[in-house]
């Protein structure tokens, strides 16, 4: 929990979250940023239901692509899965390569 809150113990150095972008796709909210020295990039993906965060995912020094799978009609997901050729990328991280080193890439399907 220390990483998510930015809280620190007396024996560790502090970490300052610097958010650079926040976007939402339906019930998923993505926040991306880095530390104050821009040496560590981070991405938080929150799932929100009825105004309450119900799930949190945290990625550090990782490139993330958010892809929509399935059809959304009138704000509701249909049970039908879209063919792979119709899976569209709706967001890609921008700041994961700032540290000048290669990072792993992940796909978050929503």
From Swiss-Prot:
SUPFAM superfamilies registered for this protein in UniProt: NTF2-like
Upregulation: Accumulates in leaves during senescence. Induced reversibly 4 days after exposure to ozone O(3). Triggered transiently by Nep1, a fungal protein that causes necrosis. Expressed in nematode-induced giant cells (e.g. M.javanica) at early stages, 3 days after infection.
GO biological process: leaf senescence; response to fungus; response to molecule of fungal origin; response to nematode; response to ozone
Gene3D superfamilies per UniProt: 3.10.450.50
InterPro entries per record: NTF2-like_dom_sf, Wound-induced_1/12_sub, Wun1-like
Highest taxon of the lineage: Eukaryota
Protein name: Senescence associated gene 20
The species this protein was found in: Arabidopsis thaliana
Source lineage: Eukaryota, Viridiplantae, Streptophyta, Embryophyta, Tracheophyta
